[in-house]
């Protein structure tokens, strides 16, 4: 690995990446993609949603149940969650993910102030 020309901050970060799971309404697909890139470039390992059902991805009711449960497992894997709450919007699914994360001792950060 070539780390000769990187800052001390980056050198200290290597191998110590925090894991963050993105939560929020899948209607905000562009925000998910932007935040994922921003957090990755800040040194986070980012776990995101697997499908954007509210942005046009076709998802059956059965798949929705599976994806909701799978997202809770993604929260389990993370150190924290990052809530994409564009214009202050937090839907029922996102609210349940926030409660789940808090009940499991995860730090919760919001894209916009609540």
Which role fits each region the language model picked out?
Residues 1-114:
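Conserved catalytic or regulatory cores that recognize and/or transform ribose-phosphate-containing ligands
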